[in-house]
Curated annotation (Swiss-Prot):
Compartment list: Cytoplasm
One Gene Ontology cellular component annotation held by this UniProt entry: cytoplasm
Described purpose of this protein according to its UniProt entry: Specifically methylates the N4 position of cytidine in position 1402 (C1402) of 16S rRNA.
Example of a GO biological process term: rRNA base methylation
GO molecular function: rRNA (cytosine-N4-)-methyltransferase activity
Reaction equation(s) it catalyzes: cytidine(1402) in 16S rRNA + S-adenosyl-L-methionine = N(4)-methylcytidine(1402) in 16S rRNA + S-adenosyl-L-homocysteine + H(+)
The enzyme's E.C. designation: 2.1.1.199
InterPro entries: RsmH (IPR002903), SAM-dep_MeTrfase_MraW_recog (IPR023397), SAM-dependent_MTases_sf (IPR029063)
Protein source organism: Chromohalobacter salexigens (strain ATCC BAA-138 / DSM 3043 / CIP 106854 / NCIMB 13768 / 1H11)
Protein name (Swiss-Prot/TrEMBL): Ribosomal RNA small subunit methyltransferase H
HAMAP family in the cross-refs: 16SrRNA_methyltr_H
A Pfam family that the UniProt record links to this protein: Methyltransf_5
Similarity field: Belongs to the methyltransferase superfamily. RsmH family.
Primary gene name: rsmH
Binding site residues for S-adenosyl-L-methionine: G56, G57, H58, D76, F100, D122, Q129
Length: 331
């Protein structure tokens, strides 16, 4: 989907030319694009950080609204995303290789620690990653069972399945996939790997399908298992928790934190983080007179959680489960 610019948000006439929109080449549409960027950008002259560059959908929209004095720092650990960003020619834009959990260190290196006007995190796997069979994220396309966000680092899904105990495998399926039949599926996988290695996505998908006794309507039986393995292999929830804390440290007072998540585990983590920072130090004695400043409230909520409307879902069905939450750092 090509992004249609709002005329009121058009690039400034003297701003550098924004990189050509090549999102269509990847059949990828950034979810909640306009809403996220509008919530993020309180100052066109500010410094912003896109913690999940992907194929640049959000970064491109930020640059379109950024003045010549503004600055955008983006991060990604996917080599394909880095290759896309390397083609961009805009003096306001810098792309760094790294995990979004490292964003405070990356911001420090760029002399932007506590100077950021906004941090955007678009969490989870991207459409280009799902659509590329060689990455091993999707049960709909046969390919090597990899699932790593950065294929140059860490253990692949196939390697993990080959060595993990049945009990630990079941725990991962239950914790990260909320899979009711985790034990049954883990047992089937362990039995199969005793006969031959499970190395491809189609092998795993068919195995889970055969072992699953009750399919959810409209959902492939392997959906939850693939999600669980991907989250575990990439340490996604630990990374997200660290990224939220790092974002809070990197923001300037008044800076915005915008997070888009795609499943309940992510959203619960984000919701809890924002809620706790809005409430402040709730462990202080309730029977003592306490000034508001003593509560050490770090964030203020900005609006309610937002979901894509039906028009966006019709254009991009993968947006259906997205939730966006916005908070502002207090001084």
């Amino acid at each position: 989907m090509q992004h249609r610019d709002n005329p009121e948000k058009a690039p400034l006439s003297d701003a550098p030319t924004v990189v050509e929109d090549r999102a269509a080449d990847y059949r990828h549409a950034s979810v909640l694009l306009d809403g996220a960027v509008e919530a993020l950008m309180t100052d066109p002259d500010g410094c912003y950080l896109d913690g999940t560059f992907g194929r640049g959908g959000h970064s491109r929209a930020i640059l379109q609204r950024l003045s010549p004095q503004g600055r955008l720092l983006a991060i990604d650990r996917d080599p394909a995303a880095l290759a896309e960003g390397a083609t961009w020619d805009d003096p306001r834009f810098t792309l760094r290789h790294g995990r979004f959990a490292e964003l405070d260190d990356i911001a420090r290196d760029a002399a932007l620690h506590r100077r950021l006007s906004g941090v955007l995190l678009d969490v989870g796997v991207s459409s280009p990653q799902l659509d590329d069979a060689s990455r091993g994220f999707s049960f709909l396309r046969d390919g090597p069972l990899d699932m790593r966000m950065d294929p140059t680092q860490g253990e692949s899904a196939a390697d993990w399945l080959a060595r993990v105990s049945e009990r630990d495998m079941s725990d991962v399926f239950k914790r990260y996939g909320e899979e009711r039949f985790a034990r049954r599926i883990a047992k089937a996988i362990v039995a199969r790997r005793g006969e031959r290695p499970i190395t491809h996505t189609a092998d795993l998908a068919e195995l889970v399908k055969a072992a699953h006794p009750a399919w959810e309507k409209g959902k492939h039986p392997a959906t939850r298992v693939f999600q669980a393995i991907r989250i575990h292999v990439n340490g996604e929830l630990d990374q997200l928790e660290a990224a939220l804390a790092a974002a809070l440290e990197s923001l300037a007072p008044g800076g915005r934190l915008v997070v888009i998540s795609f499943h309940s585990l992510e959203d619960r983590l984000v919701k809890r983080f924002i809620r706790d920072k809005v409430r402040g130090d709730t462990h202080l004695p309730r029977d003592l007179p306490i000034r508001d400043t003593q509560l050490n409230r770090r964030l203020a909520m900005v609006g309610k959680a937002r979901r894509p409307d039906e028009d966006e879902i019709a254009l991009n069905p993968r947006a259906r489960s997205a939730v966006m939450r916005v908070a502002q750092k207090l001084g």
